[in-house]
């Protein structure tokens, strides 16, 4: 579990103190979420999905650069590759983009999800599912996208 948290901290960055106004921090904490990042332009928390899986949800706040959500998706994927994590594949549904990565040393798969549609303008919802399980079917990957986006949107006011 310590390795899991360490990897997530390395992937998501440092902690500060000022959550975006549209994120329901109290509800996240009441539901057992653990804060990773707390800034005015980004908020992130992790939640245990089952005994082998964690979901880290991050809200990025601000104007999107040229290229929109697709650019954010590629940027997040490329940041993780710089950390020595292997790229496996990518996909997309109507709901979001997904990138499948593998951390050889830790033996974990990371599924990075970026929601396509912004429920609130200038709030981009991302999720990283960390698990020992490998999911490859289109239905499994679609379910991961749905899980991450649904969990993220659940805590927006």
Predicted features, each with a name:
Residues 20, 40-44, 56, 104-113:
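Short, surface-exposed coil-to-beta transition loops
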Residues 24, 29-34, 126-157:
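Surface-exposed amphipathic alpha-helical segments
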Residues 26-69:
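Secretory pathway targeting signatures of secreted, lumenal, and periplasmic proteins
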Residues 20, 32-36, 84-87, 153:
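Short glycine-aromatic motifs
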Residues 4-13:
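Sec-dependent N-terminal signal peptides
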Residues 30-31, 49-52, 93-95, 115-124:
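Short, solvent-exposed coil/turn segments at beta-strand boundaries
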Residues 14-20:
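Sec/Tat signal peptide C-region and signal peptidase I cleavage site
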Residues 80-118:
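Signature of long, low-cysteine stretches enriched in small and polar/charged residues
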């Amino acid at each position: 579990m310590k390795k899991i948290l360490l990897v997530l901290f390395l992937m998501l960055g440092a902690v500060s103190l000022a959550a975006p106004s549209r994120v329901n921090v109290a509800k996240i904490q009441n539901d057992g979420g653990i804060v990773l990042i707390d800034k005015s332009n980004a908020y992130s928390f992790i939640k245990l999905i089952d005994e082998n899986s964690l979901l880290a949800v991050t809200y990025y706040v601000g104007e999107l650069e040229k290229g929109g959500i697709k650019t954010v998706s590629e940027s997040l994927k490329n940041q993780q590759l710089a950390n020595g994590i292997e790229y496996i594949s990518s996909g997309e549904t109507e709901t979001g983009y997904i990138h499948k990565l593998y951390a050889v040393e830790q033996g974990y798969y990371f599924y990075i999800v970026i929601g396509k549609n912004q429920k609130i303008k200038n709030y981009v919802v991302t999720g990283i599912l960390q698990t020992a399980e490998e999911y490859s079917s289109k239905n499994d990957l679609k379910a991961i996208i749905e899980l991450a986006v649904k969990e993220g949107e659940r805590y927006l006011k």
